[in-house]
UniProtKB/Swiss-Prot annotation:
Name by which UniProt lists this protein: Protein PA-X
Compartments in which it is found: Host cytoplasm; Host nucleus
Domain notes: The probable endonuclease active site in the N-terminus and the basic amino acid cluster in the C-terminus are important for the shutoff activity. The C-terminus acts as a nuclear localization signal. The C-terminus is recruited to host protein complexes involved in nuclear Pol II RNA processing.
Site keyed Important for efficient shutoff activity and nuclear localization: positions: 195, 198-199
Highest classification ranks of the organism: Viruses, Riboviria, Orthornavirae, Negarnaviricota, Polyploviricotina
Biological processes annotated in GO: viral RNA genome replication; viral translational frameshifting
Gene3D superfamilies: Influenza RNA-dependent RNA polymerase subunit PA, endonuclease domain
């Protein structure tokens, strides 16, 4: 699973997921299913926000890569992926600027057009079950909830899906492709079932014992099958800007 994650996702997303896990004392090499889940969630958050801007009239518009316009403002503020201190700093700044109610839990995004925080969910189960779990945890009508599944289903607060159909279709297609690639490698069942994941982990540990002397360096070459998984939705300027924004706090 770890090899799959490193080949499947943008290196920046992998790096952010590793830092998020280490912040909570978790090891991506051991908890590989969680590693995959965090990377998937991060990518959905980025895809949710990418290409969406607000023009000078306050209208939401979509600008594809290659159509730069310095006057446009990103519609969504990405909160997910930052360390907790920086994330809460961003949330507090948004609340002070806009006057919106401060959430009890860190949300994933802020929508400047609708003036609301958004909680993104990606589930391997039924969307309505996961939605209810999220709603019960957040207990606030101020935070908008949007759940996606690997089967193409989605559910959102008051059936308000925020994004246009094409943008949501990109996310659903990506999730479905990830599921297919996991299944083709025999990884999907353990990703869905915690019990199966524990069984697979024990099996992997046993297999590693007699091979302790073998080289452990992982190849970073991408197979032809995985080239279709490479997230090309992030243009280079956007990637660089996001990377600088997320990682600058680590250098202080």
């Amino acid at each position: 699973m770890e090899d799959f994650v490193r080949q499947c996702f943008n290196p920046m997303i992998v790096e952010l997921a590793e830092k998020a896990m280490k912040e909570y004392g978790e090891d991506p090499k051991i908890e590989t299913n969680k590693f995959a889940a965090i990377c998937t969630h991060l990518e959905v958050c980025f895809m949710y926000s990418d290409f969406h801007f607000i023009d000078e009239r306050g209208e939401s518009i979509i600008v594809e890569s290659g159509d730069p316009n310095a006057l446009l403002k990103h519609r969504f503020e990405i909160i997910e992926g930052r360390d907790r201190t920086m994330a809460w700093t961003v949330v507090n700044s948004i609340c002070n600027t806009t006057g919106v109610e401060k959430p009890k839990f860190l949300p994933d995004l802020y929508d400047y057009k609708e003036n609301r925080f958004i909680e993104i969910g990606v589930t391997r189960r039924e969307v309505h079950i996961y939605y209810l779990e999220k709603a019960n945890k957040i207990k606030s009508e101020k935070t908008h909830i949007h759940i996606f599944s690997f089967t193409g289903e989605e559910m959102a607060t008051k059936s308000d899906y925020t994004l246009d159909e094409e943008s949501r279709a990109r996310i659903k297609t990506r999730l479905f492709t990830i599921r297919q690639e996991m299944a083709s490698r025999g990884l999907w069942d353990s990703f869905v079932s915690p019990k199966e994941a524990k069984r697979q982990l024990k099996k992997d540990l046993k297999l590693q014992e007699p091979c302790a002397g073998l080289p452990t360096k992982v190849s970073h070459r991408t197979s032809p099958a995985l080239k279709t998984l490479e997230p090309m939705w992030m243009d280079s300027n956007r990637t660089a800007a996001l990377r600088a924004s997320f990682l600058k706090c680590q250098k202080r």
